[in-house]
Structures are given as structure tokens and as C-alpha cells.
Amino acid sequence: MSEKYVVTWDMLQIHARQLAQRLLPVEQWTGIIAVSRGGLVPAALLARELGIRHVDTVCISSYDHDHQRDLKILKKAEGDGEGFIVVDDLVDTGGTAKVIREMYPKAHFVTIFAKPEGRPLVDDFVVDIPQNTWIEQPWDMGVMFVPPVCDKK
């Protein structure tokens, strides 16, 4: 990855609210399935914005910190996804998205961020990201002091 895209908590909440607007009316949804772990925070934000209380998870392991590896399904939500919004933070190459589509063919699959290779696999997303960009999510970062530019020697 040659570029980094840093996401702040404020940006994430703004993007989630934009996505929630597109998912109205809420009456069409039975619940949300969050793709663990990346989709947990966006799913919580969407659940709040849409007033949805039925939230389940599908647990798929595909990354070891910053390296992609083989997919491993750890836990699956029941059903074919009918009436459910499946939420992940991003769609990258589409590996996880393909598995999600097979497990939940009737679900509405959304992400906050989408890269070109995976974009066709989601029903909706908010932000286009170049394929060669690494996304730094706010839950993966700590807050630290950075000295002013004029203090650097």
C-alpha cells in the first residue's frame, strides 16, 4: 500500500449518518448483521441512527494486523439475510464480500469505504478509496502529542 487515508471518529460518524439516510425507510429492515471486527463500529452507528435493536454478527477473520490472509469463518448469523443490512467498514479486493454474498444472498450489503476491486460486490457505500490506499480506522489509532513543525530539528 503506497497511500494512507486516516479516518477520524467525526468523519466516521458523518459517513455513517449519510449511509443511514440512504437506508430509509427503516420499516423495510428486520435487523443488522455486523461483519466482525471492522463492521462492528459502523453497525453500531447505523443501528443508533435507524433505531434498529436487532443486531447480530458474522465473524470472519481475513487480516493479521496489516496483512491479508486466508478467510476463516468463526461465527455465522442465521438465515439468508432477507430483511437484514450487512455492514462492514470497507470492501477492498472483495474476498470477504464474496463470502458474505454467498452466506447472505438476500441481504443488503453496505460499507462506509469501497475500493475499485470490491465496489461491485456491495449495494451501497459512502466513500470511494483508491485501491492502493491503506485505511487507518479510528479504533486502530491512539491519540498522541505531535510537536509543532517549528520545533522539529
Swiss-Prot record:
GO terms for cellular component: cytosol; plasma membrane. Its cofactor is Mg(2+). InterPro entries: PRibTrfase_dom, PRTase-like, Xanthine_Guanine_PRibTrfase. Mg(2+) binds at residue 89. One of its GO terms (molecular function) is guanine phosphoribosyltransferase activity. It is an enzyme of class 2 (transferase). Keywords: Cell inner membrane, Cell membrane, Glycosyltransferase, Magnesium, Membrane, Metal-binding, Purine salvage, Transferase. 5-phospho-alpha-D-ribose 1-diphosphate binds at residues 37-38, 69, 88-96. Pfam families: Pribosyltran. The keyword Lipoprotein does not apply. One of its GO terms (biological process) is XMP salvage. It is a peripheral membrane protein. Its main location: membrane. Xanthine binds at residues 92, 135. SUPFAM superfamilies: PRTase-like. Pathway: Purine metabolism; GMP biosynthesis via salvage pathway; GMP from guanine: step 1/1; Purine metabolism; XMP biosynthesis via salvage pathway; XMP from xanthine: step 1/1. It comes from the Bacteria. GMP binds at residues 69, 92-96, 134-135. It is found in: Cell inner membrane. It catalyses: GMP + diphosphate = guanine + 5-phospho-alpha-D-ribose 1-diphosphate; XMP + diphosphate = xanthine + 5-phospho-alpha-D-ribose 1-diphosphate; IMP + diphosphate = hypoxanthine + 5-phospho-alpha-D-ribose 1-diphosphate. Guanine binds at residues 92, 135. Its EC number is 2.4.2.-, 2.4.2.22. Belongs to the purine/pyrimidine phosphoribosyltransferase family. XGPT subfamily. Purine salvage pathway enzyme that catalyzes the transfer of the ribosyl-5-phosphate group from 5-phospho-alpha-D-ribose 1-diphosphate (PRPP) to the N9 position of the 6-oxopurines guanine and xanthine to form the corresponding ribonucleotides GMP (guanosine 5'-monophosphate) and XMP (xanthosine 5'-monophosphate), with the release of PPi. To a lesser extent, also acts on hypoxanthine. Homotetramer. This is Xanthine-guanine phosphoribosyltransferase. It comes from Proteus mirabilis (strain HI4320). The gene is gpt.
